Regions:
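Conserved alpha/beta core segments of nucleic-acid transaction machinery
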Residues: 142-173
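Conserved AdoMet/S-adenosylmethionine-binding subsite of the radical SAM
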Residues: 1-139
């Protein structure tokens, strides 16, 4: 039995997906995600009745998004990730910087290099949401819809919120200490 199941979202926005792959739609992605979630929840109910009942994908589900192929902002991507993490069985969202492999299809953008720093910043922001309880709007907002490629998202937040510092680590709550750049779990 599989430990985790993954359904690939591919492109974060339905309109962009239609632009690059008109034959695909997000419904064909979200429907299987729903089936997996239903299977996990039914399995959990069955285990309440029968302790040795087999677990269905015990590590939950994951998905992946390609970033940089279309014009979505990091804010759009992180809001989608946050919504996915709100599902009871979603454990991990992976981000993959777009790499042009088919240069003959005019629908696909021709980038000089993959957006690897952006991909890394999205992983850092994802970590802040999952383990540090940051909200999307604390990481990116309308005035800063994309992550700063020069500094990590936690430092960028700290620079935008000087009123939060200094922090007395002997008296501050754990959650506040975790927001200090350089301190982590």
């Amino acid at each position: 039995c599989a430990d985790r199941m993954s359904v690939i979202i591919e492109i974060p926005n339905e309109a962009s997906l239609k632009l690059l792959a008109p034959e695909k739609d997000h419904e064909s992605v979200y429907r299987p995600m729903g089936y997996i979630q239903q299977g996990v929840l039914e399995s959990a109910e069955e285990r309440k009745k029968h302790r040795h009942a087999p677990r269905f994908v015990p590590a939950g589900q994951s998905t992946q998004m390609i970033v940089g192929a279309t014009g979505e902002s990091d804010r759009d991507i992180l809001y989608l990730s946050s919504a996915l993490y709100g599902r009871p069985t979603m454990r991990r969202v992976y981000y993959s910087g777009y790499v042009a492999v088919n240069t003959y299809d005019p629908r696909l953008p021709a980038l000089k290099q993959p957006p690897l720093v952006r991909e890394n910043r999205l992983y850092q922001a994802d970590w802040l949401m999952r383990f540090y309880q940051f909200k999307v709007e604390e990481i990116v907002d309308e005035t800063h819809p994309d992550l700063d490629l020069e500094v990590d998202p936690k430092l960028a937040w700290a620079l935008r919120h000087p009123e939060q510092f200094p922090v007395d680590v002997n008296r501050a709550e754990y959650e506040r200490i975790l927001r200090v750049p350089g301190i982590g779990v």
